[in-house]
Amino acid sequence: MMGKSGSQQLLMDEKIYVAVGSDLGNKSTLVWAIQNTGGKEFCIVHVHQPLYRKEKEKTQKILDKYLQKCRQMQVCAEMIHIKMESVEKGIIQLISERNVKKLVMGAASDTRYSMRMADLLSTKAIYIRQEAPATCCIWFTCKGYLVYKRESIMGNTSLEYASTSSGQDSVRSRGSVIPSRQFTISRGNGNVYQLAVFEAEKSKKEASLEAFKHQEVVKEKNEAIKRGKEWESAYLEELKQRKETEMELKKVREKLEKMRYISENRITESYMLVQKLQDKYNLATKVLRKAKEERDLLIKGRDIAIIEVEELRKEVSRSDEHREAPQYFICPISLEVMKDPQLAADGFTYEAEAISTWLQGGHETSPMTNTKLHHTKLVPNLALRSAIQEWLHASSSFRK
C-alpha cells in the first residue's frame, strides 16, 4: 500500500475535475478547488440536457466565465460537455470512462449552507458519493467550505479513511460503505472495535440518508401540491381574464359593426348624391352644347344676312333704273317679295307664312337643298326686311 505522502503526491499529479452547473452558482466550488487541491491542470465538467440554440449560447457564455476565472488564477483549464438527462449519471459515466482520480463538486446550493452543515444535502451529491468508483477522490464543498471528502481506495485490499468536516471517519467503495467481509483486518483486537464502530456509523448514515430521502420526497410532494394550487389559481385567473377580454372584444365588435353600418349608409347617400350631381352635370352639358350649336347657327345666319344685305344694296343701286325686285327679295316658295323674311336652319330666307306652312305640312327637309333640317326654329332676318322696306319705299317714291 502506498504511503500517505506518496498518495498525496500522486493525487497532486492528477488532473482536477470540477463539476459546475449552467449558472455561476458553482463559482465558489471552482475557486476552492484551485486554492486547496494543489492541482495545476483543471477540467471543468458540465452535464446538461439537449439545449435549444438560445439556451446553448447563454450556457456557453456562463461556462466561458469559468474558464476566464481559471486564467485569472493562472491555472490551465479545459471544458467538457456531457449531454445526458441525469446529471449524476453523466458524472459517474465520466469518472468511469476517463478513470477520473479527483473530482470537486457542490454538496448543496450555496443558499442552503450553514455553519452546522455536516453532511451532503444534494441528492445528486449523495448519489455520486455512493455510486462513484472507489478509485476517485471526491471533495464536496458549499459556499467555499469543504463539507465532506470521500477518499479514494488505490488498491483492492487497501483502505483510506476520509475525514469529514465533522471529524468523523468512514471507509467507502464506489461511494458506499465497504462491507467488512470484503477485507481482512489485521490490526489486532482494536480493529474489531473499529469495525463495530464503522458498522454502526454505516447504519447511522444509511438511516440518515433514508430519512433525508424521505424528507426530500415529502418536500417535493408539498412543493408539487403548492405548485398545483398555484397553477390552478393562475388558470382560474387566466380564465377570468379571458372571459373579460372576450366581453370587451364582443363590445368592440358590436361598436365596429355599428360604425360600419353607419359608414355604409353614408357611403350610399354620398353615392346617390354624386349620381344626382352627375345627372345634373350631364343635362347642363347637353343644354350648353345645344345652346352653343344654336348660337353658332345664329352667328352663321347673321353673317349670311350681312353678306346678302350688302349684295342687295348693290343690286338695288344697279336696279334703280329698272325698279325690279332683287332676287333676294323673292321668297323661294311663294315667289313673291317677302314682307316678313325668316332665316331657316338651311341658311336660306323665306316668307314667314310660306315656310311655316311648309313645316306644318310635315316637311323636315330644306325647300332649297332637300336636306334634313337640324331644327325647325326660324330667326327673323331683320337686315333683309329693312332692305326690302327701303326698296319698297324707294319704288313707291319713284312711281310717284
From Swiss-Prot:
Residues 229-298 form a coiled coil. CDD domains: RING-Ubox_WDSUB1-like, USP_STK_Ubox_N. Residues 324-398 form the U-box domain. One of its GO terms (molecular function) is ubiquitin-protein transferase activity. SMART domains: Ubox. Keywords: Coiled coil, Transferase, Ubl conjugation pathway. One of its GO terms (biological process) is protein ubiquitination. Transmembrane segments: none annotated. Its EC number is 2.3.2.27. Pathway: Protein modification; protein ubiquitination. Functions as an E3 ubiquitin ligase. PANTHER family: OS02G0152300 PROTEIN, U-BOX DOMAIN-CONTAINING PROTEIN 36-RELATED. This is U-box domain-containing protein 37. It comes from Arabidopsis thaliana (Mouse-ear cress). The gene is PUB37.
